[in-house]
C-alpha cells in the first residue's frame, strides 16, 4: 500500500519513503516516528489527530514516553520532507491549536493498494520475442552465402549492443534511485560506553562544545545497548538540542528504529 499526496508526492509507509511523482530521483527516507505520525495523519484525513493519539500510537505502544516538543520535531521532519520532494510552496499539514494536527482539507489524498499477484505475473512474464519467418533459399553461389553470413553477424551485433545499453541503463537507474540517508552528512566523532556520537561534518570545528553535549546525553540515562547510534548537530544558536537515538547505523540500515530525545536549555549552561 502507498499514498499519493496532492498529486505530487508518493508515501510508502513500509519503506518510510517520500518520492516525487514527477522525478523519482527526488526521495527522502523519514525517521520511524515521523513515518508513523504521517501514517496517522493520512488515515485520519480530513479529521484532526489529537496529540495524545500521536503519543499513544507512535511512542507509548513501543514503551516510550516523550515530551510534547518531540512530537513537534517529528511533524517538522515531515514538513521538510514534503518541501524536499514535492512541488509545493505551502504547508500540507495544519496545526490545530490545543488539539493536534491534520492534513489541510483542500489536499487531494489517494490510497493505492498493490495487487501482489498481478505484479508478480507482470514481472515474471517472459519477454515477447519476434521471430523472423526465415531466409528464403537462394540459388546463388558464394556471393549469396557471404551475404547471409554478414546479415547474421550484423543482427547479432545489434542484439549485443542493445543488451549492453539496457544493462548499463538499468545499473545507472538503480544507483540513482537509492534513497538518500537522512543523516548522510553526519560523522562519528566518539564512541563512549557503547554510544556512537555522530555530528554534522560542518560542525566538527565546534567540538570544543562536544563535552558539554556528551555529558548531558549520558547523564540523561540513555541506554547505549538499545540505542547505540546518536545523531545531533552542534548548534550553539539553539537553546535546546534534539538527539536521534537509533539501534542501528542509520546510514547502513534502511530501518534503524530511531526515537527522538529533546534536551532543553543545553546552551544556557
Curated annotation (Swiss-Prot):
One record GO biological process: regulation of DNA-templated transcription
Signal peptide stretch: none
Name of this protein: Uncharacterized protein YqeI
Family recorded in the similarity comment: To V.cholerae cholera toxin transcriptional activator (ToxR).
DNA-binding annotation, residue ranges on this chain: 3-105
Coiled-coil features, chain-numbered ranges: none
Alphabetical UniProt keywords: DNA-binding, Transcription, Transcription regulation
Lineage: Bacteria, Pseudomonadati, Pseudomonadota, Gammaproteobacteria, Enterobacterales
Domain of life: Bacteria
A molecular-function term among this protein's GO annotations: DNA binding
Entry-linked SMART domains: Trans_reg_C
A UniProt-annotated Pfam family: Trans_reg_C
The encoding gene: yqeI
DNA-binding listed as a keyword: yes
Amino acid at each position: 500500500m502507498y499514498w499519493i499526496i496532492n498529486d505530487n508526492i508518493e508515501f510508502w509507509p513500509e519503506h518510510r519513503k517520500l518520492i516525487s511523482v514527477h522525478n523519482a530521483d527526488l526521495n527522502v527516507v523519514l525517521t520511524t516516528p515521523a513515518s508513523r505520525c504521517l501514517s496517522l495523519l493520512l488515515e485520519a484525513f480530513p479529521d484532526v489527530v489529537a496529540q495524545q493519539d500521536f503519543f499513544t500510537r507512535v511512542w507509548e505502544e513501543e514503551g516510550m514516553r516523550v515530551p510534547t516538543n518531540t512530537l513537534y520535531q517529528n511533524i517538522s521532519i515531515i514538513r521538510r520532507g514534503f518541501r524536499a520532494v514535492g512541488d509545493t510552496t505551502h504547508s500540507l499539514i495544519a496545526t490545530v491549536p490545543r488539539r493536534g494536527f491534520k492534513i489541510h482539507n483542500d489536499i487531494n489524498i489517494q490510497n493505492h493498494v498493490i495487487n501482489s499477484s498481478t505484479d508478480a505475473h507482470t514481472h515474471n512474464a517472459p519477454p515477447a520475442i519476434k521471430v523472423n519467418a526465415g531466409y528464403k533459399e537462394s540459388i546463388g553461389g558464394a556471393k549469396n552465402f557471404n551475404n547471409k553470413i554478414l546479415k547474421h553477424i550484423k543482427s547479432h551485433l545489434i542484439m549485443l549492443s542493445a543488451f549492453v545499453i539496457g544493462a548499463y541503463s538499468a545499473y545507472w537507474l538503480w544507483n540513482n534511485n537509492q534513497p538518500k540517508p537522512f543523516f548522510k552528512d553526519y560523522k562519528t566523532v566518539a564512541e563512549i560506553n557503547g554510544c556512537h556520537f555522530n555530528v554534522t561534518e560542518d560542525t566538527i570545528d565546534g567540538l570544543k562544545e562536544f563535552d558539554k553535549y556528551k555529558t548531558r546525553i549520558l547523564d540523561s540515562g540513555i541506554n547505549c545497548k538499545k540505542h547505540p547510534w546518536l545523531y545531533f548537530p552542534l548548534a550553539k544558536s539553539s537553546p535546546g538540542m534534539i538527539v536521534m537515538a537509533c539501534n542501528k547505523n542509520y546510514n547502513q540500515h534502511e530501518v534503524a528504529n530511531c526515537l527522538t530525545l529533546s534536551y532543553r536549555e543545553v546552551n544556557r549552561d
